[in-house]
Amino acid sequence: MGGLNRDEGVEATDAVLIAGPTASGKSALALSLAEQTGGVVINTDSMQVYRNLRILTARPTPDEEARAPHRLYGHVDASVNYSAGRWVADATAVLNETLAKKRLPIFVGGSGLYFKALTRGLSAVPPIPPEVRNDVRARLERDGAEALHAVLARCDSETAQRLRPRDRSRVARALEVVEATGRSLTDWHRDGLPPLLPAERVRAVFLAPERDALYARIDARFGAMLAAEALEEVAALAERRLDPLLPAMKAHGVPALIRHLRGEISLERAAEIGRADTRHYAKRQFTWFRHQLPEFIWAAPAEARQVLERAEAR
């Protein structure tokens, strides 16, 4: 099967998956493919769903979105605790609509869990009652993540062993699940939902730039974001006084820039923290995809298009 012509029909390949670290050129590749094939670009990044953070999350520009259909970008308010489960539900509707129109779905982003949900399935954890979530968060603020990790170790040792004791979000999530449902997060993962797109029906590529060049691009892009009024974007968000544990409030650069707006640190220091956090995230993305989704073909950004065109659906 050669090329990526939509005329081949959905039987040839159901979707293209383009992953990679932040600032690796994923969006440009996806847009180019969408223009070539008449495809639909579908966001697979957990931060680009938020309408309030177009600049700081490097969402496609309005001009880029006008060149091809883009879905699941900026459709969620920052006040929403948007989850992988919510994204799967939204993506299912978009995927079905796209395939019904005989168009190529092009999933693009850097959120490994979203891609894993596409090709491997997702755990079927039920909604957590607000009173349980609020109680766990209050204890997190009062006692700290390490204390909650010790509690988790007693009631869900298997999950606790996989988590860093200082990982506030994941420790709190695991604890609220076991306290709300009486089952461990590990058990829920074992009884997960089926994959939306089995791996054998997709072409999947991971853009793997040379590290030093990637880090230089990350640093330059953060400066460009500030020049494009990312600080004003964060200021508007800060005025709403949202829960700092919400996903949007933890986007790279947001906490540091809020500290600057409060007068706690200089803008230069906030930018330094934002750049460092983004570089560390990119490093984790390399590691995560290598171990969790080995079916993705790794390619240099300049070669990724050719790799996709040569690849057989796996």
Swiss-Prot record:
Q: Top EC class per UniProt?
A: transferase
> Which GO terms of the molecular function aspect are on file?
ATP binding; tRNA dimethylallyltransferase activity
Required cofactor(s):
Mg(2+)
Tell me, what is an example of a GO biological process annotation in this record? Answer: tRNA modification
Catalysed reaction per UniProt?
adenosine(37) in tRNA + dimethylallyl diphosphate = N(6)-dimethylallyladenosine(37) in tRNA + diphosphate
**Does this entry carry the keyword Nucleotide-binding?**
yes
Subunit structure of this chain's protein: Monomer.
Q: Which family does it belong to?
A: Belongs to the IPP transferase family.
PANTHER family listed in its UniProt record? TRNA DIMETHYLALLYLTRANSFERASE
Q: Briefly, what is this protein's role?
A: Catalyzes the transfer of a dimethylallyl group onto the adenine at position 37 in tRNAs that read codons beginning with uridine, leading to the formation of N6-(dimethylallyl)adenosine (i(6)A).
Q: What is this protein called?
A: tRNA dimethylallyltransferase
Q: Encoded by which gene?
A: miaA
